[in-house]
Regions:
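Hydrophobic membrane-insertion alpha-helices, especially the h-region
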Residues: 10-21
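Disulfide-braced loops of extracellular cysteine-rich modules
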Residues: 33-36, 44-47, 62-66
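Functional-site microenvironments in short loops/helix caps that host divalent-cation chemistry
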Residues: 85, 91, 130, 137-262
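Short, structured beta-strand segments at or near domain termini in extracellular proteins/domains
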Residues: 263-275
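Ser/Thr/Pro/Gly-rich low-complexity linker/stalk segments immediately outside membranes or between
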Residues: 26-38
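Short, hydrophobic alpha-helical membrane anchors of single-pass surface/secreted proteins
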Residues: 4-10
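A short glycine-rich, aromatic-capped structural motif
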Residues: 74-142, 221
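Extracellular, cysteine-rich, disulfide-stabilized repeat modules with beta-strand cores
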Residues: 39-42, 51-54, 69-71
Length: 275
């Protein structure tokens, strides 16, 4: 009898523990604090305040959006702007790269401009996109470059992209040396520390706490971004919503493939405008 009582008590304790875990997990997934100011949690997503979730997409006219994003008829959208990067010389060494086997080299970048935000469906003119503020993905580097040419720009070179993310101080993350948290970068959404069950990126520019000192957003996470390598090939930089570990989000993170993918987007770079 005593064994039955102990066994029954153990089962009850396990059920209670499981219920607590499920409650906490559900609360974290719907906790408004996980979404930046101007957005609120709707299931696995962060939608503009006043919106609801329909078919996995944020729907309705938002009453409020994060700083830098404007309310539109179908959601919050980043207002395109360019950021001037003054350029300079960046020396990379094994210490800068945490002894990851990267050879010491020096990068010199001249002044250029770069989009503050990833290119969105609204800016791209996508037809039938469920949310205009989401970044464009599943586009080849050539198609992305063609769009940038129409805008008077091009894809950034790998060195330009790196310099925009690290600055001359070789920042580990675009905002600084530490502090990779969910409020600064959109990562690990599918599976990982910021997991909500989402299956795609968040709104471009929705994490203002993760911007670089120059004011460039989403250089870590959300979508990886095309940049041109010295041999004219293209590779995706910076990690994405699928990235699960810090090493995939650091400023020097580069993916090996050259194919279009649902976690790869882009932004454009430009020659500097006259002062």
């Amino acid at each position: 009898m005593r064994r039955q009582v102990v066994l029954g008590t153990g089962i009850l304790a396990a059920i209670v523990a499981l219920a607590i875990v499920l409650f906490v997990a559900r609360r974290e997934r719907t906790d408004p604090a996980r979404c930046p100011a101007g957005l609120w949690a709707q299931g696995p997503r962060c939608c503009g305040e006043g919106q609801s979730l329909a078919g996995g997409a944020c729907s309705g006219v938002p009453t409020r959006c994060p700083d830098g994003l404007a309310p539109r008829a179908r959601g919050c959208v980043a207002v395109p702007r360019r950021v001037r990067i003054l350029g300079g010389t960046l020396t990379l060494s094994p210490n800068d790269w945490e002894a990851e086997g990267i050879a010491r080299r020096t990068i010199t970048v001249t002044e250029f401009e770069i989009d503050a935000f990833e290119v969105t469906h609204d800016r791209f003119g996508s037809v039938g996109a469920p949310e205009p503020g989401l970044p464009v993905t599943s586009l080849s580097a050539e198609a992305a470059e063609a769009f940038c040419r129409v805008q008077g720009g091009r894809l950034p070179s790998a060195d330009e992209w790196l310099f925009a993310a690290t600055g001359i101080s070789a920042r580990r993350f675009p905002w600084g040396p530490t502090g990779l948290v969910c409020r600064r970068a959109t990562f690990g959404l599918v599976e990982g520390p910021c997991g909500t069950g989402a299956t795609g990126p968040e709104l471009a520019g929705a994490r203002p706490d993760g911007k670089s000192p120059d004011g460039v957003l989403d250089l870590a996470g959300n979508v990886a971004e095309w940049a041109r390598e010295p041999n004219a090939s293209a590779r995706a930089h910076g990690g994405s919503f699928r990235s699960r570990v810090a090493g995939e989000l650091k400023s020097w993170s580069v993916e090996g493939g050259e194919s279009a993918a649902d976690h790869v987007g882009f932004r454009c770079a430009y020659s500097p405008t006259p002062h």
